[in-house]
Amino acid sequence: MKIILALLIFSAIILFHELGHFLLAKKNKIVVTEFSLGMGPRLLSTEKNGTRYSLKLLPLGGSCAMLGEDMEDESKGTFNGAPVWGRIATVAAGPVFNFILAFVFAVLIVTLVGYDPAEVTQVESSSTVAEAGLQEGDIIKEYQGYHIDLARDLYLYMYLNNPQEDETIHMTVERDGKDVELAFKPDVQVRYLLGFNRKSTDSLEVASLIPGMGLSETGVEPGDVITSINGTRLESSDDYTAYLAEHPLTSEPVTITYERDGLEYNAEVTPSESRTAVLDFSYNLAYTKTQGFEVLKYGTLEVKYMIRSTLLSLKELLTGGLGVKDLSGPVGVVDAIGSTYEASKSEGMLTIWVNMLYMAALLSANLGVMNLLPLPALDGGRLVFLIIEAIRRKPVNRQIEGMVHFAGLMVLMLLMVVVMYNDILKIF
């Protein structure tokens, strides 16, 4: 069931994208030779008014094939025979239709559950942010120059940009209908750590050591099992957590016992200081119901958030914050939709509908953004050549354009294979 649902959502998004190309092609008197859903051999096919409508074997894509699209033919009815602005509109229509579909889904989501205002719910009384004047009930409108429409905007920015100890935080909040400017430095949380990562096992097994900290300067190695601290026996990882709650580590050395190959060893460890900048306030992540024209407003803001999060993810990819292994292709998307469906079933039908609508809206907005990237073989790459043609008033050499798009297609196909391989590894 979850796979069928995922494929239906994925297919609907692709179909609507291609529908944008199709309708604008017809509007600009460009002959559409085939409008298809899926890839590979045809399963069903019919022809009407010169256009073949097809359902193909693999439900992982679609196409809107136009007459003379990849040729130099500029005769009547061909893609290149249409006015340049008509061609620009036809190519851009696919991504635009994805944004329209995302907006429709977002409006339905807001109608069902509302939106999430970035309202401050708690401020630590002794914190620097309290001294700066932040109060419960304030609505955060701007953070470090980053405009905040929804609580998720703030969460996304803070997730990608951890505050630094010497950083000055600038924040604009709305209070009693007026904007209030705040500036403060983060509080600093000082902790002492042994400097290791645990394995997700019952015993306190060392997964890895953090260079330059505590345990890395002893004889402890990954795979060793820590069995006691200062004489207190530790049977499990939970025991370690409980020990730290009762006896927080300080700069004073501690004695640990660890086991390796059935033998126990002792080591004296001096915990390492760790300083973390923290913002001692909490903000709302729950949803508030709304109605009337506000639904359209917050539906628009939902789509804006989805587009913004996609662009920020691309920025992280380019700057090294994310890698190719973090990308997902059709296989990963189908698995994510299926997993979301399974996780939502226990919460009832409303949760299932909202989560499926959200996944569909996010995917549609994501597809719109990705297709507008100025890369060969994508709609954005084709738009670059068409805009150059509009400015120069003559087309770029068709053969050169074709070779550029072909090279881009080969690179994209290779990337798709790598991403699909990673998706399969993640699943199995």
Spans of model-derived segments:
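Alpha-helical transmembrane segments of multi-pass membrane proteins
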Residues: F10-I14, A65, N98, A102, ...
